[in-house]
């Protein structure tokens, strides 16, 4: 019960082609269904040019068509139903509904939900009656209250929008196109906004906006004079806007404190409508200076229904949040380790999680351990050759902690102890895992009072921040370490 295509063709005797296609509409989704239903008997809908020639030939409307054609003009081909089969590219397109009224040819191809050979009875094809009903509805719309060709041209220009209402995706809902026109006009008066492509529906309920800023810090510390430590901060601003209306407008401002690190390499979601040029041109490739844009960073947008990432950014912070040193060396059968951590004074001393993983690859199980920790607790996983230093939620007032110890390892078993291709010999690392709530390393925050909302109802606005470590490594300074950049030495 659907249509594959619809045409309006102006019959123009005396012209080279004999007519002009004034309007056509194809429905690709219905065409895929036709291919599946018809199987080996499927014939695709042709382009407008071949269809025009085939239809005019079948209707005997070509000026030079005077010869008798048995397959078209024979007694067995007398047509009483306005249903035709068109010869296109050596194949026959059937059924084609077509009739001529006032120099305008109305044509459509209905979907047949079965094989076309042998031809099924027309009465069993529900799309035939729908196609004919739509064509008659278009005829009534075009010539009702028509005074001249200008009126006809205006109504033809309205057909694409009307068919979206009356026959969406090829399924006829209302053959009275005047009803669709009235519906469009009433919507344009009461709701001039167009539904954005990324928004598939409308929200109904309590208005609320949630803003979450998550910064991730990566770090490589070597403890060597000839190799520079590296660190990188990347941030993501996630939003969830539950607002009523088709296109509610929201503006969120990200701000920095006086000593905050400017945001760079900003990438925004497609729903953002405009941006200050200074935001787009701020790049981490450029050398930082006092003239760098430091906000506020305003993002006007029309939110989608689901949670989305409003923007991503990077930043060049002056120092890593936790400075560390790791010394590991072998003395006979023993391994001596010394670890020191210092929390930078600018970092909030309130962790959700803070722990250091100290793996010993390519060795046997830990058989003996003597250690001294100035702070926190040490967990030993002997078979995994792993130490986990649980620092806890706060550093001490001095902001410095240390761990020293001596380890002895047993005989390495087969496929039991952890193996690593890089950590050979004394090449080793500590991996720091930490998370701080209500804090960002750049100082970036979303001011709840500066959020502008243009929608019905006053929303509840919530803002969250957190800093998370990712690939935060402290390498053994007493052994070689992998680097991906040149040494500082000439």
Curated annotation (Swiss-Prot):
Q: What assembly does the database describe for this protein?
A: Probably part of the adaptor protein complex 5 (AP-5) a tetramer composed of AP5B1, AP5M1, AP5S1 and AP5Z1.
Q: In which tissues is it expressed?
A: Widely expressed, including in small intestine and testis. In small intestine, highly expressed in cytoplasm of villi epithelial cells and internal glands. In testis, selectively expressed in maturing sperm cells (at protein level).
From the Swiss-Prot or TrEMBL record, give the protein name: AP-5 complex subunit mu-1
Entry keywords, A to Z: Cytoplasm, Endosome, Lysosome, Membrane, Protein transport, Transport
Q: Indicate how the chain sits in the lipid bilayer.
A: Peripheral membrane protein
Function noted in UniProt:
As part of AP-5, a probable fifth adaptor protein complex it may be involved in endosomal transport.
Task: Give the subcellular location.
Answer: Cytoplasm, Cytosol; Late endosome membrane; Lysosome membrane
Q: Does the keyword Oxidoreductase apply?
A: no
Gene name? Answer: Ap5m1
């Amino acid at each position: 019960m659907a249509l594959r295509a619809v045409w309006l063709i102006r019959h123009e005797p005396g012209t080279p082609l004999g007519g002009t296609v004034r309007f056509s509409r194809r429905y690709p989704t219905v065409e895929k269904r036709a291919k599946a239903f018809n199987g080996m008997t499927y014939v695709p809908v042709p382009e407008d040019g071949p269809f025009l020639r085939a239809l005019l030939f079948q209707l005997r409307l070509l000026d030079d068509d005077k010869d008798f054609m048995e397959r078209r003009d024979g007694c067995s081909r007398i047509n009483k139903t306005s249903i035709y089969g068109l010869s296109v590219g050596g194949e026959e397109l059937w059924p084609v509904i077509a009739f001529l009224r006032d120099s305008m040819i109305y044509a459509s191809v209905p979907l047949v939900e079965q094989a076309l050979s042998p031809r099924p009875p027309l009465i069993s094809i529900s799309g035939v009656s729908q196609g004919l009903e739509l064509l008659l509805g278009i005829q009534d719309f075009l010539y009702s209250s028509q005074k001249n060709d200008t009126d006809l041209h205006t109504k033809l220009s309205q057909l694409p929008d009307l068919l979206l209402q009356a026959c969406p995706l090829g399924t006829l809902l209302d053959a009275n196109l005047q009803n669709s026109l009235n519906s469009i006009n009433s919507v344009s008066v009461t709701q001039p906004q167009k539904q954005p492509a990324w928004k598939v529906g409308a929200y109904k309920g309590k208005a609320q906006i949630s803003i979450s800023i998550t910064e991730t810090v990566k770090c490589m510390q070597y403890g060597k004079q000839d190799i520079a430590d590296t660190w990188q901060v990347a941030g993501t601003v996630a939003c969830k806007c539950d607002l009523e209306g088709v296109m509610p407008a929201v503006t969120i401002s990200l701000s920095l404190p006086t000593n905050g690190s400017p945001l760079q390499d900003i990438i925004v979601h497609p729903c953002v409508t405009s941006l200050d040029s200074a935001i787009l041109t701020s790049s981490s490739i450029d050398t930082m200076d006092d003239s760098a844009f430091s906000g506020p960073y305003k993002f006007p947008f029309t939110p989608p229904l689901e949670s989305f990432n409003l923007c991503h950014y990077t930043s060049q912070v002056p120092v890593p949040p936790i400075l560390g040193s790791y010394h590991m060396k072998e003395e006979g059968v023993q391994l001596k380790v010394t670890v020191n951590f210092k929390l930078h004074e600018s970092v909030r001393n309130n962790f959700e999680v803070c722990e250091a993983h100290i793996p010993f690859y390519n060795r046997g199980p830990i058989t003996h351990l003597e250690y001294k920790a100035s702070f926190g607790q040490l967990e030993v996983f002997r078979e995994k050759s792993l130490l986990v230093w649980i620092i806890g939620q706060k550093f001490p007032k001095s902001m410095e902690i240390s761990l020293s110890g001596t380890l002895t390892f047993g005989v390495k078993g087969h496929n039991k102890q952890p193996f690593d291709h890089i950590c050979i010999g004394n090449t080793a690392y500590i991996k720091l895992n930490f998370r701080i709530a209500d804090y960002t390393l750049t100082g970036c925050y979303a001011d709840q009072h500066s959020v502008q909302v243009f929608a019905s109802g006053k929303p509840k606005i919530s803002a969250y921040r957190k800093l998370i470590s990712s690939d935060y490594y402290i390498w053994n300074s007493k052994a070689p370490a992998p680097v991906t950049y040149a040494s500082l030495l000439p």
